[in-house]
UniProtKB/Swiss-Prot annotation:
Keywords: Cell membrane, Membrane, Transmembrane, Transmembrane helix. Pfam families: SUR7. It comes from Yarrowia lipolytica (strain CLIB 122 / E 150) (Yeast). The chain crosses the membrane at residues 11-31, 88-108, 121-141, 154-174. InterPro entries: pH-response_reg_palI/RIM9 (IPR051380), SUR7/Rim9-like_fungi (IPR009571). Residues 1-10, 109-120, 175-728 are cytoplasmic. It is a multi-pass membrane protein. This is pH-response regulator protein palI/RIM9. Residues 644-660 have a biased composition (Gly residues).
Length: 728
């Protein structure tokens, strides 16, 4: 239990002082001889008696006493009145007692329980009021008895009266403060309760309660059986069969274009149904990466038997027969759950036949060790499509038997790959028929094998095409391939070397000497090259222009083509194809005319960066002009016969020249160096139109080459990649 050092502490201090003052007044004479309430002529008066100061005698202590009768002149009241009032001096001890009780109550106000109780403070306040009245009464008695001879003992009672009054005020303030706090707390509590009540009411109103009438008494789970027959095919097991009428087309079931519903399959004939096809989970990946039947249809698409399997079987497993029909003739019973070809060319196999297989001429069966061989030794003969029908097998347009598709089929190499077309040549071999140009139309071309047997172009053999073949009447005749069959005979490559002379003589436009010509297959683009061939005897065109610049449209040399080069050199032929280098050059030919100033210009930005040509004299030529008939410089003379260049017209010794060192067939007499031909004596004929730095000055006389022939072209003019002033 502790004290609260608040307003109760001040109250306690005030009451203690008031109690002390009153106690001093009560302890006056005759209790003590020093403290008196009043004095008159050698007598001192107190609460309980009086004392004579001179002789030191005191009256017995008691309530009320009789004053000295001898001298009544000194007091305001007569002696009888003063004797009655002397009995009221007993109020001093009573007032002191009340003050003591109030002091104790003020001390208890420091305790937690009484201090927080407004009733306790109210009791203290009520008790302080009589205490104050008693103290005030004691002071009044003193004044009546001892005035005008009141001593200091009477004045301290006045001080005690004032302090008791102050303590009453403090008690009132304390109670008011406590009551205010309690009222404030109560108000706060009431406000909080109201807010909480409002919140609770709002929270309760946010819930909606359903009545018991809307709540079902129990839950019911119903199972409804669907009678929709359109969904029956989606739940068919894998071993079930769906039979269709003969010739009825259900839908496209090819792996190349499968639909969403693959539960029904086509029937090739009305003899035997097929097993349902399962959709491969890798269909989309195969369609994205490869085209259907990239290497052609597999041999096991055509119901052919192989080692360990009968006809129409699937790798040793007999075909599945219908549950309500007999087994086809020549076949044994099939086990449960087996899948076979069922005499249906639409069957693609389990993995769409992605394994590559080698090609070969008809009769080799194009068998693969992974897919089984056809017509193995001692095995059952193949059961192909022609045995199932009375007439010849008919395939739709664009569909071919396995192994008989052309090599350059657009479907062979996959999407985005364009095969290079083969050049059709006119064979010069006796007995070979010329190849006619292709006939315009939608039918694909044919392909001829090495053995000379024509075979149709297969193209993209998909199951859609097989379905079309299944719908075709069996007695219909097959469509003949456009353009007819072509028979090519094999001719060794070296045999064409002996035929080049005959072909050259046969295809030559007119007899006569021909200028020296180069193989232009390796020439690069030159905008100054002439479009027309050089005339015989033209020295400047054959030497300056033709040797270094060449012509745009030169015939393909006969020595580099195996056979039938006439179709290539003939521009009017539909099979004419310009050389690749010519196509490359034509793509860079400027549309506008080229200025002649480019002939003396250079790509170098400064003259100091250009090489010095000591033999270049500008457009005016060397001083003194050119000498007619001057021989070429030593570096332009031809090599000796034993060091021939080995070209087609140079006659080298055992270097692969034409006719092994013999004279070239088109070699003719060349005009003398520096002139000899009409219009070729100009000094500008020696200028190379491509670059002035490559010009050279002719010599004044010509020395015959060692071991050479007159008119032989110098070695430096064989190609512009050779010589001291090469164009590279």
């Amino acid at each position: 239990m502790g004290l609260r050092m608040k307003s109760a502490t001040g109250l306690l201090v005030i009451l203690l002082i008031a109690f002390a003052l009153q106690l001093v007044a009560v302890l006056s004479v005759p209790v003590t001889k020093t403290i008196s309430l009043g004095s008159y002529q050698d007598h001192k008066f107190g609460v309980f008696g009086y004392c004579n100061v001179k002789d030191g005698t005191c009256s017995p202590a008691g309530v009320g006493y009789n004053l000295v009768d001898s001298d009544n002149a000194g007091f305001s009241l007569p002696s009888n009145a003063r004797h009655t009032l002397s009995n009221l001096l007993i109020v001093h001890p009573i007032a002191t007692g009340f003050t003591l009780i109030l002091t104790v109550l003020a001390m208890l106000a420091h305790i937690q329980g009484p201090a927080s109780s407004s009733r306790y403070l109210l009791f203290c306040l009520v008790f302080s009021l009589p205490t104050f009245l008693l103290v005030l009464l004691s002071f009044l008695v003193d004044i009546l008895l001892f005035v005008p001879h009141l001593d200091w003992g009477g004045w301290i009672v006045l001080a005690a009266t004032i302090l008791v009054a102050i303590s009453g005020v403090v008690l009132c303030v304390m109670r008011r403060t406590l009551s205010s706090k309690k009222a404030m707390k109560k108000h706060q509590l009431d406000t909080t309760n109201e807010l909480s009540a409002f919140s609770s009411h709002k929270h309760l109103n946010s819930f909606t309660y359903s009545s018991k009438e809307n709540v079902p008494q129990f839950s019911e789970l119903r199972y409804e059986t669907s009678h929709d027959t359109s969904k029956d095919e989606e739940v068919l097991p894998l071993t079930s069969h769906v039979y269709e009428e003969p010739g009825h087309h259900v839908g496209d079931t090819s792996y190349a274009s499968q639909g969403t519903n693959n539960s029904r399959v086509n029937l090739l004939t009305s003899e035997e149904p097929q097993a349902p096809k399962r959709e491969s989970p890798f269909k989309d990946q195969r369609q994205d990466r490869y085209t259907p039947d990239r290497y052609g249809p597999s041999p096991d698409r055509y119901d052919q038997g192989g080692p360990g399997r009968p006809p129409n079987g699937s790798r040793g497993v007999p075909p599945r027969r219908p549950s309500n029909g007999p087994t086809p003739p020549g076949q044994g019973p099939s086990p449960t759950g087996a899948y076979g070809r069922n005499n249906n060319p639409n069957y693609n196999g389990g993995y769409n036949n992605r394994l590559p297989r080698p090609r070969g001429p008809p009769g080799s069966n194009n068998s693969s060790p992974f897919l089984g061989a056809r017509n193995g030794p001692g095995l059952t003969p193949p059961h192909n499509l022609q045995t199932a029908t009375t007439g010849p097998m008919q395939l739709p347009a664009g569909t071919y038997l396995p192994g008989e598709e052309p090599a350059n089929s657009p479907d062979t190499y996959g999407p985005g790959v364009i095969p290079i077309p083969e050049i059709r040549r006119e064979s010069k071999v006796p007995g070979a028929s010329p190849t006619p140009p292709p006939v315009s139309g939608n039918s694909p071309p044919t392909e001829t094998s090495e053995s000379g047997v024509s075979r149709p172009y297969r193209g993209n053999y998909s199951r859609r095409g097989s379905e079309a073949s299944a719908q075709t009447p069996p007695n219909a005749q097959p469509n003949p391939p456009p353009g007819g069959a072509q028979n090519y005979e094999y001719v060794p490559a070296r045999q064409q070397w002996n035929l080049t002379t005959e072909e050259s003589n046969a295809t030559a436009p007119a007899p006569g000497p021909q200028p020296l010509q180069r193989n232009h297959s390796y020439d690069t683009y030159n905008p100054y090259r002439s479009e027309t061939p050089s005339a015989p005897g033209s020295r400047a065109q054959s030497q300056g222009t033709d040797d270094n610049l060449g012509t745009l449209h030169q015939p393909v040399p006969t020595t580099v083509t195996p056979s039938n080069s006439g179709a290539l050199n003939n521009k009017d032929s539909p099979w004419y194809s310009p050389p690749v280098d010519e196509q490359f050059r034509n793509s860079f030919i400027p549309d506008a005319p080229v200025s002649p100033s480019e002939s003396i210009s250079s790509n170098f930005t400064s003259v100091s960066q250009r090489g010095i040509n000591p033999r270049y004299f500008g457009a005016d030529g060397p001083p003194g002009g050119l000498h007619q008939g001057a021989p070429p410089p030593p570096h332009m003379r031809g090599p000796p016969p034993h060091m021939g260049m080995g070209g087609p017209n140079m006659g080298g010794h055992n270097m692969g020249g034409h006719n092994m060192g013999g004279p070239p067939p088109n070699m003719g007499p060349r005009p003398p160096y520096g002139g000899g031909g009409p219009g070729h004596g100009n000094k500008h004929d020696l200028l190379l139109s491509g670059n002035p730095d490559s010009q050279f000055q002719p010599q004044t006389r010509r020395k015959p080459g060692r071991g050479g022939r007159p008119g032989m072209s110098p070695a430096s003019l064989m190609g512009r990649d050779t010589g001291p002033y090469s164009m590279r």
